[in-house]
Amino acid sequence: MKNHFKCIGIVGHPRHPTALTTHEMLWRWLCSKGYEVLVEQQIAHELQLSNVKTGTLAEIGQQADLAVVVGGDGNMLGAARTLARYDINVIGINRGNLGFLTDLDPDNALQQLADVLEGHYIAEKRFLLEAQVCQQDCQKRISTAINEVVLHPGKVAHMIEFEVYIDEVFAFSQRSDGLIISTPTGSTAYSLSAGGPILTPSLDAITLVPMFPHTLSARPLVINGDSTIRLRFSHRCSDLEISCDSQIALPIQDGEDVLIRRCDYHLNLIHPKDYSYFNTLSTKLGWSKKLF
């Protein structure tokens, strides 16, 4: 049968011996099947692999057809922000807690992956957000997020006063502990815990979810995915930052705005053929069971 993928990258940042075991098992299995395999440098070092081709995440993105992320959702988010810049498919083997983005069961991963490698899979394009912290005539600080961009105090929790502009038109002002700007992918993450809506992954939409607002009128807002969001801050506000996927933080200085828009590139996320988004909601998040 024709191979749909020729070069496969193995990525992830293992924290437990069981995850490292999965990395090594996957490497040996792929090599035995005749695939060209690129192993992320840190993994190869920790496994003490010899005669193995290694690369950085960027090199894997440039050279491989498929990246297999071994770990939890945090590993997937960290790797996917880089891999999304390249024309590469990404799938995950769950070695974390929730595993909402890592579909493959570690106990049955090789059989599931064998089906995927033969072309039996579901492909999705997930968009990212780009966040810019900028001041007029100053250099921008930029990062991206798969799940969400969060405005919050830097160290000590306190109320923030800010205004929100959508496509440069004033939308609303708010006094709250922060704001979560989420993709459909991130709607089942931090946004959900703050009362935000669940968006199916194919929706072209962005959600704005207030964090502990100091008014009864503040509610989550869903806007078009093509929109550009600008956050402006009261001069009384200080020690603020935005975080991307709870992994990258950008401090906000006095006089700076934050711009958030959809990224120019997307993540090519693939799933096993029997994948169901609503089944994942049920099994991972306790979504309502069938009555009959």
From Swiss-Prot:
NAD(+) binds at residues 73-74, 147-148, 158, 175, 177, 188-193, 247. It comes from the Bacteria. One of its GO terms (cellular component) is cytoplasm. Its EC number is 2.7.1.23. Keywords: ATP-binding, Cytoplasm, Kinase, NAD, NADP, Nucleotide-binding, Transferase. The active site is at 73 (proton acceptor). Its cofactor is a divalent metal cation. It catalyses: NAD(+) + ATP = ADP + NADP(+) + H(+). Pfam families: NAD_kinase, NAD_kinase_C. It is found in: Cytoplasm. InterPro entries: ATP-NAD_kinase_N, ATP-NAD_kinase_PpnK-typ_C, NAD/diacylglycerol_kinase_sf, NADK. Its main location: cytoplasm. Belongs to the NAD kinase family. NCBIfam families: PRK01231.1, PRK03378.1. Involved in the regulation of the intracellular balance of NAD and NADP, and is a key enzyme in the biosynthesis of NADP. Catalyzes specifically the phosphorylation on 2'-hydroxyl of the adenosine moiety of NAD to yield NADP. This is NAD kinase. It comes from Klebsiella pneumoniae subsp. pneumoniae (strain ATCC 700721 / MGH 78578). The gene is nadK.
